């Protein structure tokens, strides 16, 4: 009688489930989405619930001290829950080995130019290594061939046209965290835009550190105008540009805004200040001769342009005279949207060592004064839209009340206001991700209200006009 022995089969070890915690800007978000896509393609389970995962990848921010503290609080909180951590992004690039030494639960750090290696990093962590994958000088930029799984609303996507920055503003640490500018070819960007259009994206937001400098490193001169015209062939209704440096808004770029139908006339201009002395101290001296002339040209060429800016108060050496100059500038230019920040000294930047620091209480008072000045201006700018019918991209819908929330072209996601929409006279409602015509009936400092314009309303309005 012959006996046989069955050898036990070895089952492959299950891959750990991974969750992501995203902190910081939308450029960081795109990096997170690439890491999610890479891990999903490699067979890892990716969860939106940190409780459900054994490993959490935290894509961190290190732009200012408040952001660093938020990143560290997130890391410590997850560590205390017993999670294994992979620290990615700007905090990892900034502090590198110090993070591994400070947080035993951190199994790896991944720099801003190294996120494309996330699968290899995780495999090495699974094998018991502690991994430092941080390039001294970030040089990578993702493209349309790198897997990506979006984490934003299905109707909205961010598209990174370049990475890094060649400017050296005195207050900014980004070049040390992200490296010098490296642009993607126009063909690569357009190819990814087509991919996103096929996914149903209705609004595409172009981002980089200085989007108006797009192409300078690659082509020898900026090519934003050519890029916008190429993207005009993509079937996405709204294309919005963020982070436009004022000196890069040339006549050809403004003409592209005017001529390309799906480019939204929304200009995000981080001006930071108006006074030549402060701009010189910020290492932005050329901007002083540009601000007012540029804004006048924009309004002449694009009468419906929506203008957003960011300003810094309390920069070292800012006097009361400088502040009054900025206050007058804000009052006369009448921006639609303004973000105002107090100066934050960042180690490793030129401004950190500047003398004549402004007292924090004085800086805060200046910020409060500018906010008080801007709020009625913002309300007045919104009020101009009352009575008009505009296209609104619906993002939320309450089936119980019928109320919808969306945005018209004058509002960018997250940083600006919303449009609160009621059903039309015929009860018409709209699903998230769709555009509907909305008649604006009310406005406040930040938001608009209105109702869907159905066929009956349009016919009635046409009869009145006739």
UniProtKB/Swiss-Prot annotation:
The keyword 4Fe-4S applies. One of its GO terms (biological process) is tRNA modification. Keywords: 4Fe-4S, Cytoplasm, Iron, Iron-sulfur, Metal-binding, S-adenosyl-L-methionine, Transferase. Its cofactor is [4Fe-4S] cluster. It catalyses: L-aspartate(89)-[ribosomal protein uS12]-hydrogen + (sulfur carrier)-SH + AH2 + 2 S-adenosyl-L-methionine = 3-methylsulfanyl-L-aspartate(89)-[ribosomal protein uS12]-hydrogen + (sulfur carrier)-H + 5'-deoxyadenosine + L-methionine + A + S-adenosyl-L-homocysteine + 2 H(+). The keyword Plastid does not apply. Pfam families: Radical_SAM, TRAM_2, UPF0004. Residues 16-127 form the MTTase N-terminal domain. Its main location: cytoplasm. InterPro entries: Elp3/MiaA/NifB-like_rSAM, Methylthiotransferase, Methylthiotransferase_CS, Methylthiotransferase_N, Methylthiotransferase_N_sf, NA-bd_OB-fold, Ribosomal_uS12_MeSTrfase_RimO, rSAM. SUPFAM superfamilies: Radical SAM enzymes (SSF102114). GO terms for cellular component: cytosol. Residues 383-454 form the TRAM domain. HAMAP family: MTTase_RimO. NCBIfam families: 30S ribosomal protein S12 methylthiotransferase RimO, MiaB/RimO family radical SAM methylthiotransferase. This is Ribosomal protein uS12 methylthiotransferase RimO. The gene is rimO.
